[in-house]
Structure formats: structure tokens, C-alpha cells
Design a protein with these regions (language model features):
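A structural signal for leucine-rich repeat
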Residues: 117, 140, 239-240, 261-267, ...
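Consensus positions within tandem repeat domains that build extended binding/scaffold surfaces
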Residues: 22-24, 45-49, 67-72, 90-95, ...
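Structural signature of tandem-repeat unit edges
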Residues: 2-19, 29-42, 52-65, 75-88, ...
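Surface-exposed repetitive/solenoidal architectures
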Residues: 24-26, 283-290
Length: 303
């Protein structure tokens, strides 16, 4: 950081500089604005990480890569311009940028991995046709995310009902508070709705077979969930950290119900109601496991 002067929170990197070093401005709390010249071709890993006062940045077209943790936990960053010259955005590049309101992912970027985790002010995201890999937690804890769009010519992903799905529609990769899970989904991926705190209820359609690890974890306002007949497995902590009060199970035989201990790890099931089909009410109400719930409720109509 000693290479460059900061005046009233603003740093203008001189023309001719070609590189911003690894962690060069890391934890610089006086930095509010950075001006990067078009002679810079390389930004080092973690170059601006934890610059909590940094509010805006424009990346010049000379840059082709935003590296790992480049703007990690820049909690005041509201605006960032990423030019179409950028082809790589590294893991956790914008993680924790809680005030970042919008961002454009350039065509050419192929891989996203925890890139925008905990960007709590991000309202919509557009995924270009070039993106072929989206890692777990890439958009987790984006609590205000309401719209998900994927370019129609993307060969791997598509968007339906504000969900990001694989092209064949079988795997739900990630969703948001306004998601409607479409018919045809077989798998809800690990961390698909993780920390989606504005999600209050969700309908899992018939046909879903697998509900992944932490898929609805820490959705603290989620109050109800349904388990369709098709579900074969609900894995570790799938609904931990929620406010679920009611579970709707569409299975006639309680012994065929997927294990609910691990998915609800950390939650007290004796505070939850389980709603079951009318014809199976007796079996559930006398079943040793389901007796542990607050109440077994007879449903005369399908949830």
C-alpha cells in the first residue's frame, strides 16, 4: 500500500503501473474509491480484501482476470464495473459484499464458485451463455435476490420460475425467495436455497427424489415444507436452522418416509406438526417416531 497515496479516501494509481500486488490494499480502511488505469493487466489475489470503506471500483478493459478474494468482504462496495475483457472471476471474488446492488457477469466467464456469497443487496442476476460451472454457495445468502435469468443459448443451464436448473430441467442448482420449483425437477442440489432468509414457504413438486445437504439450511423464516411421495432421500441438515412448524407428508406408509432425523438436525421436532393423508392417519399417529412430533394432523385434502 505504501506504493500509492490515498487522499481523502481516493487513490489514483498512476498510468504506467501494470500490476496491483497480492493483498496490496488488504484491510485498508481509509480507501473509499480506487481509480485503476488501463495499463494495469494483473490484479493480485486478495488485492482489496476487507477494504470495508471501499464503495466503487471500475476495472479497466486491460484486465482479463479478477482473482480469488479480490474484493472479499468489501462490505461498503455498492458498484463495480466488470468489462467484457474479463474471462475469469475467481472464487470468493465478491464474497461478503453486502451492499453490492447489481453486477454484470461478462460473456466469456465460464466458472463461478462462491463468487457472490453473502451479497445481501443483490436483487437480480443474469448468467451469460458462457458459464458452464456454478459451484455451491455461489449465490447463497443473497437474501434480496428475487430474479434469476440465464441466457437462452447457455448449453448447461436454464432459468425457469426464478430457479437455475440444468438444461434438462432435472437438477435445481440454486433458487431465491421468489422461486417456484417447476415440474420435472428430480434433484434439489446441496445449498440450493441456503440462507435464503426471505423464503417463507416452498412447494416441492411430485417427481423430486433427492433433497440435498443444507438445501434449505438456515432459511430462518421458512415455516412449512412438504414431502411428496417421490422423495427417496433428504440428507444432512437439509432444513436445519429454519422456523418450520408444519411438515406435510404425502406418503401412505410412515415406514417408507425418508429419514427425518438428519435433515432436521438441531431442530426440536416435538415443536412441529406433521400433516399426513387421512387414510394413513392411524399409522402415523401410532408410529414410534412420529409420536415425537407435537401433533399428527389428519389432512383431508392434498397440500
Amino acid at each position: 500500500m505504501a506504493r500509492f497515496e490515498i487522499i481523502d479516501g481516493r487513490c489514483v494509481i498512476p498510468h504506467g503501473v501494470t500490476e496491483i500486488l497480492e493483498e496490496e490494499f488488504a484491510d485498508c480502511q481509509e480507501l473509499k474509491e480506487i481509480v485503476i488505469p488501463d495499463t494495469v493487466v494483473n490484479i493480485g489475489m486478495g488485492a482489496f480484501m476487507e477494504c470495508h470503506s471501499l464503495q466503487s471500483v471500475t476495472i479497466p478493459r486491460s484486465v482479463t482476470k479478477i482473482p480469488h478474494c479480490a474484493f472479499f468482504w468489501c462490505t461498503s462496495l455498492k458498484e463495480v464495473f466488470i468489462p467484457d475483457s474479463v474471462k475469469v472471476i475467481g472464487p470468493q471474488a465478491f464474497e461478503g459484499c453486502a451492499k453490492l446492488r447489481s453486477v454484470t457477469i461478462p460473456e466469456g466467464v465460464e466458472d463461478l464458485n462462491s463468487t457472490f456469497y453473502q451479497c445481501a443487496s443483490l436483487k437480480e442476476i443474469s448468467i451469460p451463455s458462457s458459464v458452464i460451472e456454478i459451484g455451491h454457495n455461489t449465490f447463497s445468502a443473497c437474501t434480496r435476490l428475487e430474479r434469476i435469468d440465464v441466457a437462452e443459448d447457455n448449453p448447461v443451464f436454464k432459468s425457469v420460475g426464478n430457479c437455475c436448473l440444468t438444461k434438462d430441467g432435472r437438477i435445481l442448482v440454486f433458487g431465491c425467495s421468489s422461486s417456484v420449483i417447476p415440474e420435472g425437477v428430480k434433484v434439489i442440489e446441496d445449498f440450493a436455497f441456503y440462507r435464503c432468509s426471505r423464503l417463507r414457504n416452498i412447494t416441492i413438486p411430485e417427481g423430486v427424489e433427492y433433497i440435498g445437504n443444507w438445501s434449505f439450511g438456515d432459511c430462518r423464516n421458512l415455516e412449512s415444507v412438504n414431502i411428496p411421495r417421490s422423495v427417496k432421500e433428504i440428507v444432512l441438515c437439509a432444513v436445519s436452522g429454519t422456523s418450520i412448524k408444519d411438515i406435510f407428508i404425502d406418503l401412505d406408509d410412515p415406514d417408507k418416509c425418508p429419514d427425518l432425523i438428519e435433515p432436521f438436525r438441531g431442530r426440536r421436532i416435538n415443536r412441529m406438526n406433521v400433516h399426513v393423508p387421512e387414510e394413513a392417519f392411524y399409522k402415523y399417529s401410532h408410529h414410534p417416531f412420529f409420536k415425537r412430533f407435537l401433533r399428527v394432523v389428519c389432512e383431508t385434502t392434498k397440500h
